[in-house]
Amino acid sequence: YASLAERDIYGDDYFYWELYEMAEKIQKESKTAKNTVVYSEGATSLTYYEKGAWALFVLRNQIGDANFQTAVKNYLDKYGFKNVSTDEFLKEVESVYSFNSDKFKKEWLTNQSFDIKQAVFLLKNNPMIQQYLELVDKQALPFSSKKEYLLNVLTTSPYEKVKQEVIYQIHNVPYEEAKEFYDYVANSDNVKVRQAMVQVLKEIPNEYVEAYKTFLDDGSYLTQEMALKNIWYQRPDLKHQVLDKSKNWEGFNDKNLRITWLMLALATDNYYPEKKANWYKELEGYAYSKYNS
């Protein structure tokens, strides 16, 4: 129900993406020795909350929204403020819909594994997830065979997560071969897509330096921090320039940008050596817990 409340606020795409990430975590944990059986004692918190949420999502899809809501209402009216079990709830479901509760329990409540095929089938009801999964299926293909497809998705898809996945798939592609992608991101105002480029770009091409500097002006402290570090490490000739630009940055409550700046400034040769003693004292001061995030 917390996820449903978020769905009302943030929309279907957010809701389905949360379900997708839950499914990935549950699938991974179900392959370990940990107890991922919902209907048991000693299961992990991931099992109780996230696999349990998935079980309810599946149930709601199987019996329909109206029947699900009726079953929940009847259940609460009948058992409010009482100690009850899952079986009582399933009986209420059976009273409003012809439902095989034994089969549901076996597949979703007493099973160590996670039915990823059914999960993917349900997730594909959302257009964003459908396009995202189509894109993921192309991860192993050579760039030359999917370049036009990726560029079309990047420039036309309305979905932020999909655009990010495109950027992740070009992380090993030389700049000369993917120039259109780099240029598109440089001119984009989507913070998350720009952040994805900063995350994956291990070396800043000479032709992209000026465009890359614009990431320092992004409305994301994380993007700014990554861009500052990358330019400082990769372009010694620009160290003083980017430090001057970022000297008044603070960042999150944990002072991530200020602390990063101090560390880089202290490690930079011939950069205000007369101020370094004070900078070092300031950096020491940020070690106190009041600056922890």
What do these predicted regions represent?
Residues 261-293:
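Long, low-complexity regulatory tails in eukaryotic proteins
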Residues 12-23, 67-78, 214-216, 244-247, ...:
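Short alpha-helical "patches" and their helix-cap loops
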Residues 222, 241-252, 279-284:
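HEAT/HEAT-like alpha-solenoid repeats
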Residues 81-242, 270, 274-278:
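Beta/coil-rich, acidic/histidine-enriched accessory regions frequently appended to metallopeptidases
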Residues 1-57, 61-63, 79-80, 96, ...:
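Acidic/His/Gly-enriched intrinsically disordered linker/tail segments
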Residues 195, 225, 251, 255-271:
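Alpha-helical scaffold segments
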